[in-house]
Amino acid sequence: MAKGLVASGRRAPAWPKDALRIGFGIIWLIDAVLKWLPGFRSGYMDTIMGIRDGQPGGLRWWFDFWVNLQHPRAMFFAYLVAAVETLIAVALIIGFARKLTYSAAIVFSLLIWATAEGFGGPYTSGSSDIGTAIIYAVVFAGLLILSYYAGPARYSADYYLEKKISWWWRIAELRRPVPAEAPAQAEIPAPASLVPQPADGAAADGGVSRQLTK
């Protein structure tokens, strides 16, 4: 069965996978808007330091590194987080550089999970989940795998950029898109009037020859 076709032989619609990407982008956009509020910036460093205080001794060095790195420039990192989340959200919604966006978002989500969320804190008393950022990373990985099998997204900026820029697929797709094949045209038989007919003289000669051989 050809790829992209359902069991009935009809091509699977493109909009469900694009709707998933856009819906997830809207969730990220809401989260990004909250990051631009003053409350996030004012409590940013307190959150990082609070996460460090509850970590076991074997992980203390990891959180000390991030606290020491960000503490002198906490406002810069707070704005950086808000900007990165905004860029990811916009790229998701419009479908821009999907392979690059998904890959960068996986790394960013894992970094948030390993710092601001303290690996979800499954080893701390009273922990009830492993954090949300790791779930975001899994969703981005799913979108990346889906793009590999589904190919170019019809409702995305990448779809049109790939037509204009020959190398754009390298940052938008996991593999080079296969050019669409032109539909095969059925062979139409020529009308009988156009089929060459033997000349009358040749037909007569053939008849005489057959009579002489008898």
Locate each region found by the language model:
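Extended, low-polarity transmembrane helix blocks
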Residues: 1-84, 94-214
